[in-house]
Amino acid sequence: MKAVLKIEFQRLFRSVTFYISMGIGLILTMTQFVMVGLQESMHILDAYSPKGISEPYGVFSSYFGMAGPPLVYRQIYYLILPILAVFAYATTFCVDHNSGYVKNLYTRTNKKYYYAAKYIVSCTAGGLVATIPLVVNLIANMMVLPSLKPVAALGCYAGNGIALWGDIFYTHPYIFMVLYLILIFFYQFIFVSLALLLSTWVNNRFLITLFPFLLNYFSYMMLSFIKKAKYSPIIIMDMTRINALRFGPVVLECVCLTVLFGGVYFWRQKKDEGL
């Protein structure tokens, strides 16, 4: 198992698709930084008015996950995250079967080790391409803006004190950022698990990449129609929508969907003959 896992991680860090996904994410987050954070760093006091309820520009008001307009970069980012997470490495399952790689591998190791290693590395890759661009944006903002502690009474932020980790945001904002990045990291497991599951039936790399995105967007539309959009991953991963979220349902959704898709994926390995 360790040998197969090591090989898969080596393949990951040599994978062009991993760096393409990471690059797309970085383009979006760093463009937002140039348009918002960098501009605000040159005029930090412009947002402050001693006669009104306001505060100077800071890290948390300019950060990609929390900033105001332009919103297009954040909207695109959260919308295409399923594509980036799956394209990073999960599609190599399909490539391995189409190329005959697994036929050779199954003669030297147990296929359950390959399935487990592929799952671990694919989920890790998906989580990394989703969170590293956000971390880079946060660090960039920290380099040019002051870390002003958020004040709930000012009403400058989307979240309130009773929102998901809202109390943590207003007392220890960097801990809040870490917690939310962890949440986003693990939510990619849903999309990656679904893509790997689909790969056990379909050998079309394009379809495997797009299907989790399409299903995620369709579920968002359906949940919006029945006034339950807060349960959509598109909403859950957006830090500005935390007022509608509660810890229990958010974690339960992530665990249940990941276990469901991942469980069927591992069950399907019994039928895999490497053909």
Model-derived features: positions:
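Aromatic- and glycine-rich beta-strand/loop motifs that create alpha-glucan
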Residues: 1-25
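Juxtamembrane helix-break-helix junctions at the cytosolic face
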Residues: 21, 192-207
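Extracellular/periplasmic helix-loop-helix junctions in multi-pass membrane proteins
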Residues: 202, 222-249
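Secretory targeting signals
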Residues: 26-90, 94, 120-192, 196, ...
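Central hydrophobic cores of alpha-helical transmembrane segments
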Residues: 21-26, 205-219
